[in-house]
C-alpha cells in the first residue's frame, strides 16, 4: 500500500473530492487504503471507482483498497 487515509465520517461528496486529490499523488497501479465510515460509502466508493477507472481491489466496509488507474 503506497498511501492510506482515514476519512472518518466525512460525507461522500467531500470524500470523493479529497480521494481524487490523494490518488492523483500516486503512481499508476499503486494501492491506496481508504477507511470511510459514511453509511453511503459501500455504494458510493464502488460507483466512483467505476466512473473514474480506478480499480476497487477489496471492500470490507469501512476499509476499501483502491488501485490507481494507469495513465
Give the ranges of each region predicted by the language model.
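Domain-level signature for proteins that mediate thiol-based redox and metal-cofactor handling
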Residues: 1-71
Amino acid at each position: 500500500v503506497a498511501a492510506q487515509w482515514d476519512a472518518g465520517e466525512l460525507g461522500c461528496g467531500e470524500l470523493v473530492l479529497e480521494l481524487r486529490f490523494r490518488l492523483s499523488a500516486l503512481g499508476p497501479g499503486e494501492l491506496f487504503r481508504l477507511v470511510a465510515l459514511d453509511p453511503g460509502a459501500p455504494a458510493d466508493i464502488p460507483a466512483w471507482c467505476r466512473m473514474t477507472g480506478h480499480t476497487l481491489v477489496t471492500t470490507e466496509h469501512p476499509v476499501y483498497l483502491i488501485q490507481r488507474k494507469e495513465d
